[in-house]
Amino acid sequence: MQRIALAAFLCSLAPAAFAQSVAGMWDATITYNGTDIPFRMGMSGTGANVKAWFFNGDDKEVSNAGKLENGKLVLNFDSYLAKLTATVKDGVIDGEYGPILKKMCAIHAVRASDTKSQAKVNAPSIGGQWNLQNVASSKGEKAWQLILRQNGADVSGAILRVDGDTGTLTGSYKDGKFVLSHFSGSRPALLILKPASDGTLDVSLSALHGFSEMKGVRPEEARAKGLPGPTDPDTHTTVKDPEKGFPFRFPDLQGKVVSNTDARFRGKVLVVNVTGSWCPNCHDEAPFLAQMYDKYKSQGLEVVALNFEEADQLKDPTRLRAFIKEYGIHYTVLLGGETDSAKEKLTQAVNWDAWPTTFFVGRDGRVRGVHAGFPSPGSGELYRETKDKFTATVEKLLAENQTSKK
């Protein structure tokens, strides 16, 4: 009788005593277009209260909800409308994440190893800025920027295009090359850098839109050789007639139609942001725009986001609502239509092809500036310069005498 009672007691303890915990750090890979891309993720909690986070440099992309039941792990990332589903067995996670560009991607993870025990490596110095030549751009670019920060064998940085960057790539030097990667819920990327004997870099990139090989050259050397430089994001896109402002007329999330001619915008500085909640670089820009609006709205600043989304998200913009909540957005958000319709609806824009693109309209109603793209903190000083430039433009326009809108 005592043995039966003991067995029953042990059975009652089994689910709690032997349930696997996922709390802690994990070394993971995501397979995208046949390439295994390493990244690190963290998790906490148990049962129906599991949380996970991906890293983008020092920033974290945190799941909105998650659970672990009977070895089945489910994590939701609402601001990307993505989900991670996996099995957890013997300290190994196997499953899939997505969609990323409509694809589900295999995920594999094991408990994180102790990198501190690794022997020191004498790595060549590659820190600083580089120009990347032979780029594969659909936007007419001839060069991109590569920004690297180095601490011994460890390197972090980003590739900056006219529309934005790769997110923070991190990695280290081993076997004659630097291997860096990024995955934070979006834009998976694997970057391999091989220092050449002539002081250049052989660069291989596997990312969202395929594989490419480039040559890294220091900016001063590129100028001396007459090589093309990166595209200027302040001149890449223009408008047909600055005097005519930037017209828009779209519904907000409650269905109310908002127009640039509404009285609420008259005599105000207006920042019009062409964006989409599906766009990683738009995620980079949104928190800064939210902070800028909250700081300057009492001085006469208005920010309007023209969001272009997929058809199903226009009917029920769940991802956009999560996007607004995540970044604390208090400015006006409008539904512009499907992404493919943006060009025909943005009637003033010339050479517009970057998500996001931001138009600055003065108190007089004239377009005073356009900026294509937006970098992430991974671009370092160039990220800070872009934020400073936006702030300086807004402050200058706010300081101008208020005039009636033309």
Residues of each region from the PLM?
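Thiol-/selenol-based redox modules, centered on thioredoxin-like
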Residues: 354-406
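Sec/Tat signal peptide C-region and signal peptidase I cleavage site
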Residues: 15-19
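Short pre-active-site segment immediately N-terminal to redox-active cysteine/selenocysteine motifs
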Residues: 268-270, 275-278, 285, 310, ...
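Structural microenvironment flanking redox-active thiols in thiol-disulfide oxidoreductases
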Residues: 284-327, 338-346
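N-proximal helix/coil linker or "cap" segments that precede and/or mark the start of modular domains
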Residues: 208-251, 263-267
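A short beta-strand-turn-helix
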Residues: 248-270, 293-296
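Short, internal strand/loop/helix patches
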Residues: 249, 321-363
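Central antiparallel beta-sheet cores of small beta-barrel/beta-sandwich binding domains
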Residues: 20-89, 97, 103, 116-197
